[in-house]
């Protein structure tokens, strides 16, 4: 974390930081004092998260408790990954002053990188677009990465699986789904992702239990950090009993929503249990 403690930001400085963050596909939260002592009204700080996950604190409030609370709120808002997350929070400082903070977050559009342009990739691409992802589809077969097969994709890239991500940015804002036509391609792509200095926001791989176990053994033998290996979602997706490509795509998309929105995956009917609460007298 980088702390640039230079006093509060002006409105112009905060606006410039938002513009810069958007230009570099970085997430940023602005925290503004809307109610409090007159000298503090309109003061701002910003907390920016770079693509490698580094936090940069820009500006500072004079009151230490207020400043710490503002930074904490900004971090929580950034962790939510929700663009234009708006909320207010009250803070009472040691001196007894009460402040109201307005928190506004901007996050870049998440990118879904589908590795492998087969049958699952087509419905997953369409679903990803509907969920607000910029979708990139990559494959080493030119006839598969076509506009006709993926009319809604933002990018279609023919690659060499020995260096599949040379034109793809790996960041916390990147969601990688490995659904290639063969284990060796999935493994090579996975190995490259895990050896990258910057962690992806999500890495999921399709496959049977046997195939995934073999993949993990290979990664351990390649001396990949076990912590990085543990972050792989494999088999990817939620257990919906999916069988068709479209159903599997929905199961994968559901996991992406679950993780990005920090859900629990429990059916709402089970959580609310309306019948038992209101109609079951036993």
Regions found by a protein language model. Name each.
Residues 1-140, 147-153, 157, 171-174, ...:
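Segments forming oxygen-rich coordination pockets for charged ligands
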Residues 206-282:
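Adenosine-phosphate binding glycine-rich loop
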Residues 138, 175, 180-183, 192-218:
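ADP-ribose/adenylate-binding Rossmann-like module
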């Amino acid at each position: 974390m980088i702390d640039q403690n230079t006093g509060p930001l002006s409105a112009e400085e905060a606006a410039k930081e938002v513009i810069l963050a958007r230009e570099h596909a970085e997430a940023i939260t602005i925290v503004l004092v809307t109610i409090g002592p007159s000298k503090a009204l309109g003061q701002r700080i910003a907390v920016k998260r770079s693509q490698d996950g580094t936090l940069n604190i820009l500006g500072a409030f004079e009151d230490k408790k207020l400043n710490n609370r503002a930074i904490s709120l900004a971090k929580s808002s950034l962790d939510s990954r929700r663009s234009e997350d708006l909320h207010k929070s009250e803070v009472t400082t040691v001196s007894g002053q009460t402040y109201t903070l307005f928190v506004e977050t901007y996050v870049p559009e998440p990118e879904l990188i589908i590795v492998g342009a087969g049958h699952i990739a087509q419905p997953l691409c369409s679903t990803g677009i509907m969920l607000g992802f910029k979708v990139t589809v990559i494959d080493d077969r030119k006839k598969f990465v076509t506009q006709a097969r993926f009319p809604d994709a933002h990018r279609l890239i023919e690659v060499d699986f020995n260096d599949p991500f040379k034109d793809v940015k790996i960041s916390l804002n990147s969601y990688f789904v490995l659904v290639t036509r063969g284990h060796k391609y999935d493994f090579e792509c996975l190995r490259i992702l895990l050896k990258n200095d910057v962690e992806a926001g999500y890495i999921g791989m399709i496959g049977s239990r046997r195939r995934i176990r073999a993949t993990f053994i290979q990664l351990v033998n390649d001396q990949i950090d076990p912590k990085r290996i543990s972050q792989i979602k494999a088999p990817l997706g939620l257990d919906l009993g999916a069988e068709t490509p479209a159903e599997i795509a929905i199961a994968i998309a559901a996991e992406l929503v679950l993780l990005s929105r920090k859900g629990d995956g429990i059916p709402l009917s089970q959580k609310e249990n309306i019948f038992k609460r209101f109609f079951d007298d036993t």
